[in-house]
């Protein structure tokens, strides 16, 4: 893998370990086709075109390795270098992906974690994530809260507001130096509490007292979870095509 002189390698870890039960489809949702193309390919093509991304690792649901290989070859994606097996949660999939990268990256190389079913990500979001990580040591794509917020008293009602200025949405990409992030996971694994935490990388780092730095986000950068999200993404692609822009 080519390396820039002096600089770190920028590697994207794409999480594709889910099965998409909420979608009710016959295939994992990352393989559902939108305008004839699998969602994961829409996402990978953005990384393929981005000049700052050097390589891609896909952390994949078991049993779909041959399908991934076939469509990566079909669409000529050269940056996909590695495939690791996904885990049952976000954080365990990340850990599997990190362990697979041992010996392939240096401790100072950059790992940008993103979801395979979040194809709305843009070049400016990716580039700001990498910039902030290199300056501060990590970055989390931020989605500020725009709605009025309230806390749950129970499942039926709320009696208290929450100041939206005090909270924010933590989205992907989430970007880190490889060695430091792997060390955080290994400490938690050895301590026996990795699976006791809320299953996200941000929860682990908060538990370790880390300060997380915000990078650029977008209200449009959503994870495709249900059929409404699929319709939204298809409409977005068609709109861009009508403008003569890359569909995604």
Protein language model features and the residues they cover:
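Hydrophobic C-terminal alpha-helix "anchor/cap" residues
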Residues: 44-48, 72, 101
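Short phosphate-binding loop-to-helix
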Residues: 73-109
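Short aromatic-hydrophobic micro-motifs that form the base-stacking/packing surface
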Residues: 110-114
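Residue-level signal for inorganic ion chemistry
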Residues: 14, 40, 97, 115, ...
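N-terminal glycine-rich phosphate-binding loop and ensuing alpha1 helix
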Residues: 2-66
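Acidic metal-phosphate-binding loop of nucleotide-sugar-dependent transferases
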Residues: 21, 116-120
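Hydrophobic helical membrane-anchoring modules
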Residues: 221-248
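Conserved core of the sugar-phosphate nucleotidyltransferase
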Residues: 120-215, 248
């Amino acid at each position: 893998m080519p390396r820039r002189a002096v600089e770190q390698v920028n590697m994207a870890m794409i999480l594709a370990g889910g099965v998409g039960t909420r979608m009710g489809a016959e295939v994992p949702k990352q393989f559902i086709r939108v305008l004839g193309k699998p969602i994961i390919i829409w996402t990978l093509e953005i990384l393929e075109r981005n000049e700052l991304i050097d390589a891609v690792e896909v952390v994949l649901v078991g049993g779909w390795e041959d399908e991934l290989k076939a469509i990566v070859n079909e669409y000529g994606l050269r940056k996909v270098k590695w495939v690791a097996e996904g885990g049952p949660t976000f954080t365990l999939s990340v850990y599997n992906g990190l362990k697979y990268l041992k010996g392939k990256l240096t401790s100072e190389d950059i790992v940008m974690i993103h979801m395979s079913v979040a194809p709305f990500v843009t070049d400016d979001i990716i580039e700001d994530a990498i910039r902030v990580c290199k300056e501060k040591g990590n970055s989390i794509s931020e989605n500020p809260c725009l709605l009025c917020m309230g806390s749950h008293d129970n499942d039926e009602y709320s009696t208290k507001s929450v100041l939206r200025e005090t909270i924010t949405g933590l989205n992907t990409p989430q970007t880190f130096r490889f060695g430091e992030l792997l060390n955080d996971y290994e400490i938690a694994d050895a301590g026996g509490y990795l699976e006791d935490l809320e299953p996200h990388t941000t929860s682990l780092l908060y538990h370790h007292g880390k300060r997380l730095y915000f990078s650029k986000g977008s209200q449009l950068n959503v994870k495709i979870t249900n059929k409404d999200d699929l319709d939204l993404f298809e409409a977005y692609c068609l709109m861009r095509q009508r403008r003569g822009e890359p569909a995604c």
